[in-house]
Swiss-Prot record:
Designated gene of the protein: mnmG
Organism: Desulfitobacterium hafniense (strain Y51)
Protein residues bound to FAD: 14-19
Protein name: tRNA uridine 5-carboxymethylaminomethyl modification enzyme MnmG
InterPro entries referenced in this protein's UniProt entry, alphabetically: FAD/NAD-bd_sf, GIDA_C_N, MnmG, MnmG-rel, MnmG-rel_CS, MnmG_C, MnmG_C_subdom, MnmG_C_subdom_sf
Family the UniProt entry places it in: Belongs to the MnmG family.
Highest rank taxon of the organism: Bacteria
UniProt-annotated binding residues for NAD(+): 279-293
UniProt keyword annotation of Membrane present: no
Amino acid sequence: MEYLAGNYDVIVVGAGHAGCEAALAAARMGGRTLLITLSLDNIAHMDCNPSLGGPAKGHLVREIDALGGQMGITADETSLQVRMLNTGKGPAVHALRIQSDKQAYHLHMRNAILGQENLVLHQALVERIKTEDGKVSGVVTRTGAFYAAPNVILTSGTYLRGRIIIGDAMYEGGPNGQQTAMNLSGALKELGLELGRFKTGTPPRIHRRSVDYTKFTVQPGDSVPWRYSFMPTQSMFWGRDVDKQIPCWLGYTTPETHQIIQDNIHRAPLYSGKIEGIGPRYCPSIEDKVVRFADRPTHQIFLEPEGWNSDELYVAGLSTSMPEEIQYDIIHSIPGLEKAELLRPGYAIEYDYVKPYQLSLSLEVRRIPGLFTAGQLNGTSGYEEAAAQGLLAGINAALRVQGKEPFIVRRSEGYLGVLIDDLVNKGVKEPYRLLTSRAEYRLILRQDNADLRLTPRGREVGLVKDERWAAFQKKKAAIAEINALWRGTTFSPLNEHLAEVLAGVHSAPVHGGISGEELMRRPEITINEIKQLIPQLAEYDEEALLEAGIEIKYAGYIEKQLAEIERFAKMEERMIPEEIVYDQIKGLSTEGRQRLKEVAPANMGQATRITGVTPADISVLLVYLEQKRRGGQIHAT
């Protein structure tokens, strides 16, 4: 028997990384928000690796923070170790990776939710989405509670018809022994949504006392306390000093390891037919790596701590769904793990996902106004991709409450824009992972300038509050002062200190007056050299110095990418009417017509990026729209 349990502006179903960001964003923008979770004890739980970031993923976390999201703040506060990756390459691919304390991360995020105004938290299992006149009207739980709301955000992760697989053992369930939502998939199908089936997996966890660390190579954190959040007051390491970071450890599998896997490959669910879902290309299981790369005698593994007070080590690189007894043999064949105690076996999990071509760029389901989906439910992998989608969905649900236009991030504005654009226009055939190679404008979309790109937009929608805005304005002013300082400082060729600094980095001597800006353009000159020559620069924040230096050193390349963005923007401005009937357009290819109907692109720029739509289809569409415009059947754009 149903009963009305409450009225809200926004309901978020699922309190993983997507759900937390969605609920916090909607509430912070003034929407009366309800967050429903299967378990209050698993909010923002890291079901797989205890880390955040890396290439593209770290960029996303900074973009989430720049917009006023929570993930970066929580990651910084609960960090175990920080490392800046790819420092030997250009700034476009520099990426922060933070090792997190799983339990502390969960507690910090839960406290943020419990302390948030306009946000109510409740434990329940949602079984149905209710609609009225084709629009969302609320959700119904297993106990019959009806929560009414015109906006519902589904962030159910890997919990839709979840099935755990360990060798021959298979059972219904969510990650780490949690319950799963078995009926919600059917309810979504009744609403007309097309679902698919994916799988992912996780490695075993072992006891830290059972490892012989002398057979591993230590991987310490950086001495610089890098952080995700642009807030200068953000604390790190749960209040500890930077020299208290916990290391990770590098090791390798052996030919013996690979032989054990090959001898038992017939028992691997991935190869025995027990797993039907498609797994992630960029995070293969160890059995998959052994089969696909049979010529390689070893593979890297990393032992990653799961918390300051946890005895568990996450064995990165050893994801597996092999039978439990075989997992013991695999682990004990690795040098240093001969006596390892297995605390949790690795497993695979299959789950349903919503095919994302059914969404608009706001993450609203096009056919069901008020219904949004975000996170792994949309066919992605990774905490960061999930959180970014949740943030966007939360913003757009709140804007819908306010009767405002959707918030769309373009590909040229952020990795968040690349992520959403790829999902909607290209679809997914395997769990989607964001990569720097997917972005056309990598030099523009650096992690260091995420705030310059997106914080003003977060301010416009009401998510960036006064304290963050003041910090942003201070950084912008500092960058302007730094630029003025080294542009206005000129050095004589007779300056002995200049000659010493240049000789120290094997830079050519100068034969005439030279400015600090001109010096900075030299590849071998870094901020450190400029600070030696212009002592006043020591007064400025390192982030502001870094940003100003990159903009000068790479000015030519940045200008070229900005010109490309401007040219492409003209295609984005050519709008496609919502009422267009693609079946009436002669000359479209069969696949192109089908994909255009499925995605319903809002503009020509989006149409060009749809998988299956050819350049010939674009030409036909442009001619058709121009004919209609000249005939007065559509408005000029």
